[in-house]
Amino acid sequence: MSISEISFELTNACNLKCLHCLRQTIDSGHFPVDVFEKIITQAKVYGTPHIILTGGEPTLHPRLKEIIDIIVDNDYTYNIVTNGWHFERVLEILNQRLKRKKNLTGISLSIDGATEETHDKIRGPGSFRELMKTVSILKAHHMRFAFLITVNRINLHELEDVAKLSSAVGANYLFYAHMVPTQKTAATDMDLTPEEYRMVEAKVEEIKNFTKHEVLMSMGAYTPLKMFQCRTLTMSNLNFDYKARLTFCCLLSGYREDPSVPEAEIIADMRETDLDEGIALWMERIYQFNKDKLEYIRSGNWTEHDYFPCFYCKKYFGKINWLSRFPNHPWAKDIITEGLRIKS
């Protein structure tokens, strides 16, 4: 077994309030550094995974410099996913020690429009200019970076323009991702239909033909494979939330639209658990997930929506049962008619 990536939600604190944010927790917290070091040290037996630092806004972690040093002192590579607002702080940390910059594979920047108007409508005033300022800094320091766009009804018309902008400013990669529905996005008609998801995926394939850099569709895209195995299910990606808990995947632990739904996606509290024990529990959960999915397929309840693997997973864990309150929502039919829930 070889784990290729470990994702850490360093904090759920953020300086922005994006319209499409799926993080519903009102309490803020930061990943404990001692637990971070324990995980990094114990993970070496599984190879030398790449470390991904996310949030919230990971640059707001008060001990970011210590965290980066733990990573590089253990000879891991890493990248940071950021909204671009605090990059001067990151650059100062990187410039203080050569290995911090050497082991950094790149910066992933969230972009939600090709224009200031569209981007700032989703992320707030001043966000686009801060993002472009960070791009200028990255280029001046010859640092690799990628753009990540979460596609929704507000920016749907700018998919191609985002690719042109990304290519023009020298990004190394561009990732398109489907948006996770929330009660806020449902109420404001930001969510796309399953048919529009497929149109987005087809458009991304077209865009790949004219850009100078690599263009990718993130996890969650349609697949004809009912037993599709994502990076979680192949055990190539580990994810920890800001509470130092091993979670089933990165899209689940902060997605709390309905607090009454049990947190069945939480595998282990790493404050109290060694990594080996946590991974053993993770393996058991993956086995149960696949077993339940096979039973679900055999039951004849499979729908067209289930071909989107992240949708199926959110449905399995009861994360989108709230859609029953939005009967006209394009993704609500499955929840109203059969309401798959995780087995207790």
Put a short name on every predicted segment.
Residues 8, 12-15, 224, 303-307:
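Processing junctions and N-termini across compartments
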